């Protein structure tokens, strides 16, 4: 069955209705700006409600491989899993990819799909050719796939890019990074380096000193080769650190005894809010933040939350956690 036929069946509509909707689907977005944490603005493009339904149906029908070292938007993996991969290594190198989602274009998607299909054909039996069958199912309707998955940012623009805001974008972005993740992982194994990628955040760590500073050149080369020159590193967010300095990965602190922590600054602030609660001076907004952050702290560093129960008594902490008598 063609992609149009599969989508139509999944959505319980006719093939004609499906084809008609996908004509110009790349323009069915509402865009707006949100402030970035470090200054500036990020443009979010939100698909229409109906387009989201099509995109989710597409993901239900077609499954794209994700590399083992990709930690973001993958079931069973998280920021905690990402940080824990590096906890035992004293030397750390972090960077990120500039303008990540909007740098992913249809050309990269189809190139990665074709390369993986060719590689699979050489190495597997016909019955196991999942990527090859995926490629064959989609390539005959390339124009409609592009309209479904990519956003056209300007009224007169012919350019198509992946949007921040579409339910299909996380899966497609991870897939488009597969060859890069594969190449970098192999390169890192040769150098005794641990590598993970959380969306656009790249993290490298090792037990061997003086390896990581020279690694950035190899990394930029692989970006050009594996991503068709569409992406580059954000050099302003490139940092080297070691046990002698504060090591943080996706907001989580790596302690010198190889554990994960929310960090001393956050612990002090949480205790401050608990004191405000005890005195009856906490605002509704701060109380909501406290409850939410306690849940996060319990996930990252449960021992800290246990220590709060011991210090402030179960009665006080239960009133916060379960919103008793507030």
Residue ranges, per PLM feature:
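Conserved, non-catalytic sequence blocks in retroelement Pol enzymes and Pol-derived host proteins
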Residues: 169
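Right-hand nucleic-acid polymerase module
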Residues: 1-34, 41-129, 137-166, 175-188, ...
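Short beta-strand->loop micro-motif that forms the acidic, two-metal-ion catalytic signature
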Residues: 200-207
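Short beta-strand
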Residues: 194-198
